[in-house]
Each structure stands twice: as C-alpha cells, then as structure tokens.
Design a protein with these regions (language model features):
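Metal-dependent nuclease catalytic cores that hydrolyze phosphodiester bonds in DNA/RNA
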Residues: 1-121
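A conserved hydrophobic secondary-structure block that centers on an alpha-helix together
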Residues: 121-137
C-alpha cells in the first residue's frame, strides 16, 4: 500500500492477501505509512529473501519458456504512469501476452506478472501470477 500524489491510499494485491491473513498486520502497514516513527517494519528474514529470489528466478524462467515457444510478448517497463499507459496500449493492440502489466481501479492498483489473452477472444485477458505466495505450499 502507498499514498498517491493526492494522499489517497492505494492497495495492491499483496495488501489484500495480507489483510486476509492478518487484518492486524495490514493495519500496522497502514500505520507505518502515516506514522513511520512508531511503526517500523522488520527486516526481511533470510528465508523470506530466499523465497522471493526463487520466485523471481521462476518468473524469469517461465518468461523465457514463453519466448522459446515464440509467443507474442509485450514487456512493460517504467513507472506506474508509463506502465499503465503501455498496458492499455498493449491490450488495444491485442498482444497475446503482456508481461509486468500495470492495472488500476482506485483504490486498487498493482502489477500483474502476466496478462494472457484468452484463446478465441481478442479482448479478454487472464491474470497469471507466478510468485504471489510468501511461503512454500
């Protein structure tokens, strides 16, 4: 979660997951935004850093497998504003796969690992996430 330029809260998919797991932890994240002097975030554990790195490696390997299969892939880069505009353009262009798309509908916003156009439907996309889990399943 973060405060946008208008000082409004914006929630990510990870924030929603955190709220489901622990409303208190989510509340503490919000307190950290408005009172960073009283709500200090713990340093990530080695285990959590390993899980995150493994997720990033998995995402990169999956992206490479899509490239190797010659899929039409649009890779989005840049800040939220640019990424949002580029995502809408890629959807308008009916790109098959959009990597690191940025979607927003206030008060929610976030990056999707992959938007994948449904077969036989030029305007409908599925969101595929490769690393939202915070622990092994």
């Amino acid at each position: 979660m973060y405060l946008n330029s208008g000082s409004e809260l914006v929630y990510s998919p990870s924030d929603l997951i955190l709220f489901v797991q622990s409303p208190f932890a989510c509340w503490m994240e919000r307190l950290r935004l408005v009172r960073p002097d009283v709500a200090v975030r713990d340093e990530p554990s080695e285990e959590l850093m390993l899980i995150a790195k493994t997720g990033e490696l998995h995402e990169a390997a999956y992206l490479q497998s899509l490239r190797d299969a010659n899929h039409d892939i649009c890779e989005i880069t840049g800040d939220r504003h640019h990424a949002g505009t580029a995502t809408l353009q890629a959807i308008s262009d009916q790109r098959e796969i959009i990597f690191q798309s940025y979607l927003s509908l206030p008060p929610f916003a976030g990056y999707a690992d992959f938007l994948v156009r449904e077969a036989g439907n030029d305007t409908r996309y599925e969101i595929w996430d490769t690393k939202l889990a915070r622990k092994p399943k």
